Amino acid sequence: MSIERTNPLIPITAISQRNLNEGAQEARKTGNAQTKAMAGDTSVKLSEAQKKLVQPSNQDINVEKVARLKAAIADGTLTMDSSKIAEALFREAAESITK
């Protein structure tokens, strides 16, 4: 049995990288032309309900409770009932198993 010397492998990453760069440049040119062509044709009208949803609202967050929690954390007086946390975790795990 004889072992013949083989030619070293030439990586093709340099070739594929060049092809990727050329493709990206073409895509940028085409994308810019399409963006310029479409810029004046687009308009959006929001309904009154959508405008209300976009506006920030304090009704979603109990600001007073958040302030109390922040103060308790800062003072170091916040107490946590670990049994309630454990019960909620077990309940949630049981619900996810039965679904």
From Swiss-Prot:
The keyword Repressor applies. GO terms for biological process: bacterial-type flagellum organization; negative regulation of DNA-templated transcription. It comes from the Bacteria. InterPro entries: Anti-sigma-28_factor_FlgM_sf, FlgM, FlgM_C. Keywords: Bacterial flagellum biogenesis, Repressor, Transcription, Transcription regulation. Pfam families: FlgM. Belongs to the FlgM family. Responsible for the coupling of flagellin expression to flagellar assembly by preventing expression of the flagellin genes when a component of the middle class of proteins is defective. It negatively regulates flagellar genes by inhibiting the activity of FliA by directly binding to FliA. This is Negative regulator of flagellin synthesis. The gene is flgM.
